[in-house]
Design a protein with these regions (language model features):
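S-adenosyl-L-methionine
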Residues: 125-157
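Core catalytic lobe of class I
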Residues: 1-121
Length: 157
């Protein structure tokens, strides 16, 4: 799928978690694979040293009631900062809980994200507003129209 989408697969990094993820498997997972690559016709950039490891040790979020696969913001900020500069555009076609959006906000990147599940769209917007401290200037797009967040939600900010 990576190749069919026009991407070059450079490698697979491993997110090593501080605790097991309990499931039905005989062996319990304590890691998650993260594919790393770039558009085949695109330019590959690297903005850090050559001592970076494929093993990434970041603690799981302490709570993830908002989304079943919530990622810690530092986990996403790490590869974003390694492979982009400030004001670069980052595209996240699976918005989830908004961790990529928040990582981009914290590292001065521009993030375009999409999420199909409406309840997770609400999670993304609320987490983002908590991060920036206000809903001022926050817009959402629904059915092709753009709305100020205050117009579509009951927010005290």
């Amino acid at each position: 799928a990576f190749d069919a989408a026009g991407f070059y697969l450079s490698g697979c990094c491993i997110w090593k978690k501080q605790s097991l993820v309990l499931g039905r498997s005989p062996y319990q997972w304590q890691h998650e694979p993260c594919l790393y690559g770039w558009k085949k016709k695109g330019k590959h950039q690297w903005y850090t040293g050559r001592k970076e490891s494929t093993i990434w040790e970041f603690d799981k979020p302490k709570k993830n009631g908002d989304h079943p696969t919530m990622k810690p913001i530092p986990l996403l900020a790490y590869p974003i900062q390694n492979s982009s500069m400030a004001n670069s555009v980052v595209i996240d076609p699976f918005g989830g809980s908004g961790s990529t959006l928040i990582a981009c906000e914290q590292s001065d990147r521009i993030c375009y994200t999409i999420e199909l599940d409406e309840k997770f769209c609400d999670v993304i917007v609320k987490r983002y507003i908590e991060q920036v401290g206000s809903s001022e200037g926050v817009t959402v797009q629904r059915d092709g129209a753009t709305f100020r967040f205050k117009e579509v939600a009951n927010v005290d900010n």
